[in-house]
Swiss-Prot record:
This is DNA translocase FtsK. It is a multi-pass membrane protein. SUPFAM superfamilies: P-loop containing nucleoside triphosphate hydrolases, Winged helix' DNA-binding domain. InterPro entries: AAA+_ATPase (IPR003593), FtsK/SpoIIIE/SftA (IPR050206), FtsK_4TM (IPR025199), FtsK_alpha (IPR041027), FtsK_dom (IPR002543), Ftsk_gamma (IPR018541), P-loop_NTPase (IPR027417), WH-like_DNA-bd_sf (IPR036388). The lineage of its organism: Bacteria, Pseudomonadati, Chlamydiota, Chlamydiia, Chlamydiales.
Length: 799
């Protein structure tokens, strides 16, 4: 045949090449190590474990390198280890060169020692014994060539730079080679430990110095040094001694005979005390109330019956998390989480692949800390000097391909660290149980005013935040991303950490099935709202409650709800106010699910009070949580977005939605099932959190337990007739009201001068009719020079 057959080219895969190199280097390490260990001058080559070849190799290495020859097998072993980690060839060559410089430097430094005699048996039978200058045979620890290099007759380092210079130069080269081989992550860990130790010693030194200085000052002034009593009583004498060294300056000095000071539970929970009245006054269960009566008695918004009476002295302000009547975490079901032992080894393999991938693209970097969370694993990449961070960011898809990950997230750089964070899905994901978060919170010492126990971060740490500092929150995510579970977690966080006297809830659920089970909670101001008309009435009520609270704060000269709840009550001043002032203002949290459905039905009615509450309600303890599965620009408008700095993004459909909710892409790559990005005020980057999960059975058990502990008393039983135009008294309406309403709806013009001209009435009467139309929610509020907005259509109104 005229055609020649082409020879099939055989190409080896990179894995095979690395495996072959590893075996070769490991064999050389064993070969040289065994031959050196079994070598002796006075024995025949047959006694060497490697035979004649091993005896000859050992004789050559020991003659030229001396004792430093034993480092050569370690060099081959290090090369085998680098190939096992799949270190790229250029980086492996540089590390091997650094390791090869170590025996050379050691040989020169050993040659600086005078030729030794009377060596141990192990060295005497292995290092070269040479007769020089008709002297008795001596052992040269660094080998003959390096000794001649250091102290030869014609040319020597000792003659050129001296013994001190030679030692400094080769010692510096040796240290540089060692430091180059030490991993950067190991150095950073030791540096962090050293910094913490120095900081601890510094604080202790200054504490002792200040104590001694104050003691010496009192001794010089001939005064006995007696520390002032503190508000907190130590639990043991050893703790008392430590507290005396800290020299606290108490704000309030209490008599030592006060029996309340010996009650640890009351001391730990009390953060406000009144010196003239050390005893504590509490309300009986029959007098327990759900919401302070901040409204006038004749108002339609006030509850029918109230049991609040002004007290001569305020009760101590008890933190919400320590209330003894709240259900504990034991009520929830416990789930055992098992982590396989092979997880750490698998993550180390992923880290090696990550380092190899970066090196293949010319990025020299080390792998720092490896954190394993419930569903995510995070790697800290420590790039070398000169590496652009954006270059790592551009390799997101390539890194995901090599790590075989469904999606990854790159944080470039990590705020506050000289590192780049790479988050990948955990090979063994585990759900986050809400019971674990609640248990850690109830057992811990940190207490928040409006706690939200959301989940765990990528490194496994608990993540909870205070809604009082956020102060409003938007939650967005597609169906099945975990948005509804997050809302249930938020509600459970509030009701299991705060009594009904501290936090009240207003919940809007247009779906009518997700949150209606919370209607019987004692924390509820009103049953769960399911109609958009009732939602608007509830928002209007919250606006008026906000205005009333601001009036009370202005009258008392206070700035916020915290100062109101911790004030010292003056009965005479509060009695002069025209409305009854309660002892305490509870926080009010409004939760609105499916905001997009409400905005579709009545956009202006819903958006206007939401924006006003978001702008002003923080100081008086009213906070909003909005949730939507469609984070588009017509739902999360510019006004809403500007007044809601805190946002939670679950998995969204595309990059545009992620840009709307958290101002940057990334939410479209989340894994779903509770995987979220949390943006807080003042944060440099979104925090990735795995949301906690709580089952329906646990929710029902908690609701049943709370209903048995606290009575359910609604402040407003229903918003069906609240602020409803149809419920207005016809006698209060102007006789021309219906005619003016029809005229406004037909023409679309709602101005006082227009009605004055068309109806031929005076200005005062026309202005009164406009006010009645606004109260009936037919026209919007005045917007200055702009015309009033028409809120309803003519077909929707009945004559």
């Amino acid at each position: 045949m005229g055609k020649e057959r082409k020879k099939a080219s055989v190409s080896l895969s990179p894995q095979t090449v690395f495996a072959v190199k590893t075996c070769v280097y490991l064999a050389l390490a064993c070969f040289s190590g065994l031959s050196l260990w079994s070598f002796q001058h006075n024995q025949p080559y047959t006694q060497n474990w490697i035979g004649l070849l091993g005896w000859s190799l050992s004789s050559f290495l020991l003659y030229n390198f001396g004792v430093a020859a034993f480092l050569i097998p370690l060099n081959f072993g290090w090369l085998s280890f680098l190939n096992m980690k799949r270190t790229p060839a250029p980086l492996a060559f540089r590390k091997a060169a650094a390791f090869g410089a170590i025996p050379v430097c050691c040989a020169v430094l050993l040659s600086m020692i005078s030729p030794a005699q009377n060596l141990p048996q192990f060295l005497a039978t292995r290092v070269p014994m040479v007769v020089m200058d008709l002297q008795p045979p001596k052992a040269y620890l660094g080998g003959i060539p390096f000794y001649l290099l250091y102290d030869g007759n014609s040319f020597s380092l000792k003659l050129l730079i001296g013994a001190v210079g030679t030692g400094l130069i080769f010692l510096a080269i040796l240290l540089c080679a060692i430091f180059y081989l030490i991993p950067k992550s190991f150095v950073l860990k030791k540096k962090a430990l050293l910094d913490d130790l120095l900081k601890f010693l510094k604080n202790k030194f200054y504490a002792c110095w200040n104590a001694c200085k104050k003691l010496l000052k009192n001794l010089v002034n001939n005064k006995s040094y007696v520390p002032k009593p503190s508000l907190r009583v130590p639990s043991s004498p050893s703790v008392a001694k430590k507290e005396m060294l800290k020299l606290p300056t108490p704000v309030i000095s209490l008599p030592l005979e006060n029996k309340d000071l010996h009650d640890d539970s009351s001391v730990n929970r009390t953060i406000f005390l009144t010196p003239p009245h050390p005893t504590k006054r509490t309300l009986s269960p029959q007098k327990r109330t759900d919401l302070p009566n901040l409204l006038p008695k004749d108002s339609a918004l006030a509850p029918a019956q109230t049991s609040y009476k002004p007290l001569p002295t305020p009760s101590p302000f008890v933190l919400a998390g320590d209330a003894p009547d709240l259900p504990q975490y034991h009520l929830l079901s416990k789930r055992n989480v098992h982590r396989p032992e092979s997880l750490l080894e698998e993550l180390k393999k992923k880290a090696a692949i990550l380092q190899q991938t970066l090196a293949s693209f010319g990025i020299e970097a080390a792998i720092g800390n490896i954190c394993s969370g419930p569903t995510l694993a995070a790697f800290e990449v420590l790039p070398n000097t000169g590496v652009k961070v954006q270059k790592i960011k551009a390799l997101e898809n390539d890194i995901a391909l090599n790590l075989q990950a469904s999606s990854i997230r790159i944080i470039a750089p990590i705020p506050g660290k000289a590192a780049v964070g790479i988050e990948i899905p955990n090979p063994d994901p585990q759900p986050v149980n809400f019971r674990d978060l609640l248990e850690d919170y109830q057992k811990g010492t940190q207490r928040l005013q409006v706690p939200l126990l959301l989940g765990k971060k990528a490194n496994g740490d608990n993540f909870w935040t205070d809604l009082a500092t956020m102060p409003h929150l938007i939650i967005a995510g597609t169906t099945g991303s975990g948005k509804s579970v997050c809302i249930n977690t938020i509600v459970m966080s509030l009701i299991m950490t705060s009594p009904p006297t501290d936090i009240k809830l207003v919940i809007v659920d247009p779906k009518k099935v997700e949150l209606t089970g919370y209607s019987q909670l004692p924390h509820m101001l009103t049953p769960v709202i399911t109609e958009s008309k009732e939602a608007h009435s509830a928002l209007i009520w919250l606006v008026r409650e906000m205005e009333l609270r601001y009036e009370i704060l202005r009258f008392l000269g206070l700035r916020n709800i915290q100062s109101f709840n911790s004030r010292t009550r003056n009965v005479d001043i509060e009695a002069s106010y025209d409305k009854e002032i309660s002892e305490k203002m509870p926080f009010i949290v409004g939760i609105i699910d499916e905001l997009s459905d409400l905005l579709l039905s009545s956009s202006h009615d819903i958006e206007t009070p939401i924006v006003r509450l978001a702008q002003m309600a923080r100081a008086v303890g009213i906070h909003l949580i909005l949730a939507t599965q469609r984070p588009s620009r017509d739902v999360i408008t510019g006004l809403i977005k500007a007044n809601f700095p805190s946002r939670i993004a679950f998995k969204v459909a595309n990059k545009v939605n992620s840009q709307i909710i958290i101002d940057e892409p990334g939410a479209e790559n989340l894994m779903g099932n509770g995987d979220m990005l949390v943006v807080s005020p003042g944060s440099f980057a979104p925090v990735r959190v795995q949301g906690a999960y709580i089952c329906d059975d646990d929710i029902n058990k908690v609701i049943k337990d709370l209903c048995s502990r606290f009575p359910c008393k609604y402040v407003i039983p229903s918003f069906n007739t609240y602020d409803d135009p149809g419920s207005m008294d016809p006698e209060d309406l102007d006789p021309l009201f219906n005619q003016a309403k029809t005229l406004v709806l037909q023409t679309g013009n709602a101005s006082t001068t227009f009605l004055q001209r068309k109806l031929k009435i005076g200005y005062a009467r026309a202005a009164s009719i406009i006010d009645q139309l606004e109260e009936a929610r037919i026209v919007g509020p005045s917007e200055g020079a702009k015309p009033r907005q028409i809120l309803v259509q003519l077909s929707n109104q009945d004559d």
